[in-house]
Amino acid sequence: MKNMRLTVCIGIMCGWLAAGMLHAGTRPDHVRPVEEDGSRLWLPVIRPVEGAEVEITYKGKVSPTIAIAIAELKNAWKGDPVLLEKKKTGRGDGFAITSSEHQVRILSSTETGLLYGAYSLLRMQAAGQLTVPLSVTEQPAYDLRILNHWDNPDGTVERGYAGRSLWNWEELPGTLSPRYEAYARANASVGINGTVLNNVNASPQVLTTGSLEKVKALADVFRPYGIKVYLSVNFASPIQLGKLDTADPLDKEVIGWWKQKVKEIYAMIPDFGGFLVKANSEGQPGPCDFGRTHAEGANMLADALKPYGGIVMWRAFVYSPTDSDRAKQAYLEFMPLDGQFHDNVIVQIKNGPIDFQPREPYSPLFTAMKQTSMMVEFQITQEYLGFSNHLAYLAPLWEEFFGEVRPDRLKAVA
């Protein structure tokens, strides 16, 4: 039986944490704040007085990720000297923070974990939660912590109520907005490690060489912050881009087209995460158009990605406008396929059986499918909760979901 995996697709809500910067240890206050416009969220920049810079040490080659961790601490940490050290502290990007009389140590087996530890230390400082001595251990509950953006190539955002897209595709790859690094920084500060850049109602054009060069430019900015990029893809891309007569997932030419396209992507972006697919839903093309199942469509893409370590996130949000009971359709289509999906396929299921309603039970697929890796899709944009006119606190909804879907059956969260 395959392990069930759950990845919660969530977004970051911008806001400010109003908290005074407090001392840790005995180091005097030799820093002054830099003027802020709010874009740095809870992560202020503190300008040290000349000659008063805190000592941050890392034993080893300083990579771009380590350089960021050191810079963040030098910008804002007001306590004792800090030692960053690569050391096994548990699974994945977990980390530990300890302190002795005159030193703070941040330990992790990965460079990204050390960056997370640096942000955790600064967060505790900002919130006034530092203790003496420090003894903090954090392990990621889920390996995949991904944001899904519904951004379109023209700069619009489907179900977007907070302005236009972050990505300026017309200027990429030549011009990199400082907002891209600010985005990566904010995500890394709370442990987000993946982003799907484009709308699930995807245009085949995202897979053209010119578009992939733009995606590469973003991936290069995000990489030092431990963030992989993913793309939503249109299942009929071999027809529109490859000029094939079919997108049948069992057709040899179609299989070859996807393998070649994946090879092209990984030549540009070696750590590319994989594909998100909306198929046979709301008019989007999919394997059912060719008499194939969702599993056959997903597995074909998974086979193309597997040599490079990529995954397929295959959405279970499917319904026919002619059926009067939408709540049952995902179950009826996917439950018979339990156990047929390849290991690097994750079925992405909305938290409820309808469509992001303010109140609805959890999808029965989460407890019914025993042999399939799954991920939950939450909606942060307030499509049903007031658009941009209201601010709704969503954490109780997520907490309720995890109270019903047992955490010990889940593998990942985002």
Model regions and ranges:
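A generic structural signal for short coil/turn motifs at secondary-structure boundaries
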Residues: K61-P64, I106, P204-L207, Q284-D289
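Catalytic-core regions of glycoside hydrolase
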Residues: K243-A414
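Hydrophobic beta-strand segments of well-ordered beta-sheets in folded domains
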Residues: G51-T57, P81, R145-L147, N193-T195, ...
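Feature activates predominantly on carbohydrate-active enzymes
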Residues: A69-E72, G90-G94, S99-L276, K306, ...
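Acidic, contiguous N-terminal accessory segments
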Residues: A24-V104, S109-T112, T131-P133
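Bacterial N-terminal signal peptides
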Residues: C9-G20
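A generic structural motif
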Residues: G25, W77-T89, V132-E138, V277, ...
